[in-house]
């Protein structure tokens, strides 16, 4: 094969790769738009009487996950199944955002941490990497860390809304989450930096709980006068 023929073949491979990436980008852009639309729903709990509308907001968010599953099915068809990590960077951030949204909705519904397997099911993908397009463990953990920041914000806004029991429950949840992360030996630099931010979320929530204690409102909360879940 001549040198020119070799480079023609290389250009063909480059073009094919670029075409795949362009098709992936189109689907990812649609996923990002869906995620933006979804974000306004659960975050509505921070506003005014949002706590009374939690079930309704969660239900609407879950309806959007139907769109996400359809878009995920489309994304799976855009690249060879055995090349997941070759193109992973294209959807990594939106997948982390969707993990956060799923975990926030589940927390608002049950005040528990959603499992990676449950998130994968919500998104219409696999938990096991051997089965194809899957939820990477580090993407799951990144989404959960975003949840921690959101709950720190929720603890503050709960007090403003007169719901004094919620920050206490959030504090218990976040402390358990922090204990869980301490069991991990994180090698990913980005994820480790994200985890470093968890201690600030813990501190922020502790300050809210301490303020409630100083004002005597924690007794009122544990006495059953706090807001509903």
From Swiss-Prot:
Signal sequence interval, chain numbering: none
Record key words, sorted: Cytoplasm, DNA-binding, Endonuclease, Hydrolase, Nuclease, Nucleus, RNA-binding
Major place of residence: cytoplasm
Pfam family name, one: Translin
Location of region: DNA/RNA binding: 86-90
GO MF terms, alphabetically ordered: endonuclease activity; RNA binding; sequence-specific DNA binding; single-stranded DNA binding
Localization of this protein: Cytoplasm; Nucleus
Coiled-coil regions listed in the entry: none
InterPro entries to which the protein is assigned, alphabetical: Translin, Translin_C, Translin_fam, Translin_N, Translin_sf
Role played: Exhibits both single-stranded and double-stranded endoribonuclease activity. May act as an activator of RNA-induced silencing complex (RISC) by facilitating endonucleolytic cleavage of the siRNA passenger strand.
Record's subunit section: Ring-shaped heterooctamer of six TSN and two TSNAX subunits, DNA/RNA binding occurs inside the ring.
Family under the similarity heading: Belongs to the translin family.
Identification of the protein by name: Translin
Lineage of origin: Eukaryota, Metazoa, Chordata, Craniata, Vertebrata
Gene: TSN
């Amino acid at each position: 094969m001549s040198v020119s023929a070799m480079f023609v073949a290389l250009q063909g491979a480059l073009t094919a790769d670029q075409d795949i990436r362009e098709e992936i980008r189109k689907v990812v852009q649609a996923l990002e738009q869906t995620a933006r639309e979804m974000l306004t729903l659960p975050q509505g709990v921070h506003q005014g009487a949002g706590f009374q509308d939690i079930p309704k907001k969660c239900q609407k968010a879950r309806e959007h996950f139907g769109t996400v599953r359809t878009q995920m099915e489309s994304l799976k068809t855009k690249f060879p199944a055995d090349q997941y990590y070759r193109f992973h960077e294209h959807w990594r951030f939106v997948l982390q955002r969707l993990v956060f949204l799923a975990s926030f909705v589940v927390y608002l519904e049950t005040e528990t941490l959603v499992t990676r397997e449950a998130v994968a099911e919500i998104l219409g993908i696999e938990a096991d990497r051997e089965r194809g397009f899957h939820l990477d463990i580090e993407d799951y953990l990144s989404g959960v860390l975003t949840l921690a920041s959101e709950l720190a914000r929720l603890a503050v806004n709960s007090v403003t809304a007169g719901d004094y029991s919620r920050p206490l429950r959030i504090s218990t949840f976040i402390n358990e989450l922090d204990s869980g992360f301490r069991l991990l030996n994180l090698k990913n630099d980005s994820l480790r930096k994200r985890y470093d931010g968890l201690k600030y979320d813990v501190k922020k929530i502790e300050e809210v709980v301490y303020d409630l204690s100083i004002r005597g409102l924690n007794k009122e909360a544990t006495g059953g006068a706090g807001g509903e879940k």
